[in-house]
Every structure is written in C-alpha cells, then in structure tokens.
Amino acid sequence: MWSKEQVLAGSYQELSDCLMDLLKYEMVGIILDDCTIGLVNKMLENTQLMLDNIDEFEWSDVMKVRQSNYTAIRLINTLLINQYDKIFTHKR
C-alpha cells in the first residue's frame, strides 16, 4: 500500500510536469493566461506544504488534494490539446 507521502509526491510530480508543459508551450509562442500558470504554481505550493506537514493531514485530505491536482492537470491538458493547431502553424 502506498503511503500518504508517496501519493502526494506522485501528484506533485505530475503537476510539476504539467507546469513544464505549459512553459514549453509559451516558448513556442503560445500565449496562455497568466492565471493558469499562477494557479498551477499555487497548487504546487499547497501540495508541498502538505508534504512538509504530512502528519497533520488525514488520508481524506491527501486524496482531496490529489483529486484536485488531477482535475487541474486534465483541464490544462485539454487546454493544451486545443492549442495544437497554433503550435503546428507556428512550426511551419
């Protein structure tokens, strides 16, 4: 069985990877709302805070944060998929 730390660390890594994807899109000229990047940064901070104080949180808290992170990742991936046309047009 996974520990609370392992679950949150995995969620943190997935969210961090998502932020890197967002930044890569900006490097090729896709303009994203600053709020999107700010939101992911804030979620990373909150997940790290929870990791740093893991003994103060119940499993239900960990799972809520994990689910929130996963939902944000899915929404951002959808946003990025919708930007593919702009990316391929930019590369031509």
In which residue ranges do the predicted regions lie?
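A structural signal for well-ordered alpha-helices, especially hydrophobic packing surfaces
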Residues: L19, L23-E26, T47-L51, I73, ...
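Charged, amphipathic alpha-helical oligomerization/scaffolding segments
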Residues: E14, D21, K42, S68-T71, ...
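Short amphipathic alpha-helical heptad-repeat segments
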Residues: L8-L15, C35-Q48
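Charged, low-complexity interaction regions
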Residues: M27-D34, N53-M63
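Alpha-helical and His/Cys-centered functional microenvironments
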Residues: G10, D17, D52, T71, ...
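Short terminal alpha-helical segments
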Residues: M1-V28
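Amphipathic alpha-helical binding modules
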Residues: V62-R92
